[in-house]
């Protein structure tokens, strides 16, 4: 009985071996046939869809980080002013994003990316004008959101410089002007095909001065524009009551919470990792990833150097380190490196941050004591002056 079973099992194994030997070469042939199949157009389209999807997600993620800078600005401004005016400042920061977003979508976006040398032809509700700008397949609506948060950043810079003495109704008027005219025109000149034409060889700058204008993420377009508007606004409004004595000397009006201000700077620092690296607008290729990583590094180094050298300069100048000036030094370094963060070396980023941190200290002193312009948060020095220091030509 055992012999019979053994023979039966041997026959079964032989049958299985025969089947495997017969089918195995066929599977190899089938694999060879598959490997020789050419890549179809549908495969290329699928790859392009993945690339576009990654780029879109990166752009929208960066937009969310920049949007998160709004509470950062609100906390910095609230911390640097007196308690009684906190609600007013917070309301202004809220309204300039809400109101400004609608205005920029309705008018500003068309002015910024329309056709023209000095100003774009407006296209109300017509997002098709972006076909000539978006050359990597990014959705137009997504790019609109990305530019909207940049516009909101330019608008909210002014709020702090004019704090504690601006009527809410007049602030609404200002929001209209910067959202539908000032920022769109500034952006059109540089990023929308205007006369500066960011980095283009045949631009007005090249033809007249023999060099190109480079502003990667908005050191001039966003921060410098907002900073100079802040300076003019503060000068027109005049100082707060009690800021200057009868002899003309400046009197300190301390803010009510450096804790809020410090938290706000950390939030802004975090949001800047969307502001600068996000301006690459793509993250799918190796080149994009290299640029993004480099911009992350230069942005962080400039912030650290700006804060450190502002701390050192304030310590030497006033005999003790100043937290408020150190916080503004961090922001000064971030603003300064924004234009050329994609081009400068890490050492160059440290130098830019150091210069901006030191210049900011003396700029605040000059505006306060010499020009006698009352800027409670130092916005004109941080954004206006330092925004001019790193424009790449």
Regions inferred by a protein language model and the residue ranges of each:
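N-terminal secretory signal peptides that target proteins for export/translocation
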Residues: 1-12
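Hydrophobic alpha-helical transmembrane bundles of multi-pass membrane proteins
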Residues: 12-20, 25-392
């Amino acid at each position: 009985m055992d012999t019979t079973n053994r023979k039966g099992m041997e026959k079964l194994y032989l049958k299985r071996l025969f089947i495997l030997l017969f089918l195995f070469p066929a599977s190899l042939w089938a694999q060879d046939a598959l490997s020789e199949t050419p890549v179809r157009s549908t495969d290329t389209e699928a790859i392009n869809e993945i690339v576009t999807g990654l780029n879109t997600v990166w752009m929208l993620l960066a937009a969310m980080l920049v949007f998160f800078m709004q509470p950062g600005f609100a906390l910095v401004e609230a911390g640097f002013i007196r308690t009684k005016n906190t609600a007013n400042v917070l309301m202004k920061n809220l309204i300039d994003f809400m109101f400004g977003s609608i205005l920029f979508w309705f008018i500003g976006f068309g002015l910024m990316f329309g056709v023209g040398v000095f100003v774009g032809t407006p296209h109300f509700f017509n997002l098709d004008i972006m076909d000539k700008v978006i050359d990597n397949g990014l959705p137009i609506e997504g790019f609109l959101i990305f530019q909207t948060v940049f516009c909101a950043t330019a608008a909210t810079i002014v709020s702090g410089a004019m704090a504690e003495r601006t009527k809410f109704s007049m602030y609404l008027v200002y929001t209209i002007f910067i959202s539908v005219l000032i920022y769109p025109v500034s952006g059109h000149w540089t990023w929308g095909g205007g006369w500066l034409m960011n980095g283009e060889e045949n631009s007005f700058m090249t033809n007249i001065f023999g060099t190109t204008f480079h502003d990667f993420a908005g050191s001039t377009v966003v921060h410098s524009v907002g900073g100079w508007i802040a300076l003019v606004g503060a000068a027109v409004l005049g100082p707060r009551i009690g800021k200057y004595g009868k002899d003309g000397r400046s009197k300190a009006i301390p803010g009510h919470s450096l804790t809020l201000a410090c938290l706000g700077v950390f939030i802004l620092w975090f949001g800047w990792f969307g502001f600068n690296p996000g301006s690459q607008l793509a993250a799918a290729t190796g080149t994009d990833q290299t640029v993004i990583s480099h911009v992350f590094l230069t942005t962080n180094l400039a912030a650290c150097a700006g804060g450190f050298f502002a701390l050192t300069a304030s310590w030497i100048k006033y005999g003790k380190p100043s937290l408020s000036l150190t916080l503004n030094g961090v922001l000064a370094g971030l603003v300064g490196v924004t234009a050329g963060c994609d081009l400068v070396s890490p050492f160059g980023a440290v130098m830019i941050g150091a210069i901006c941190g030191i210049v900011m200290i003396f700029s605040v002193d000059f505006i306060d004591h010499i020009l006698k312009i009352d800027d409670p948060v130092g916005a004109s020095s941080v954004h206006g002056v330092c925004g001019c220091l790193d424009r790449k030509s």
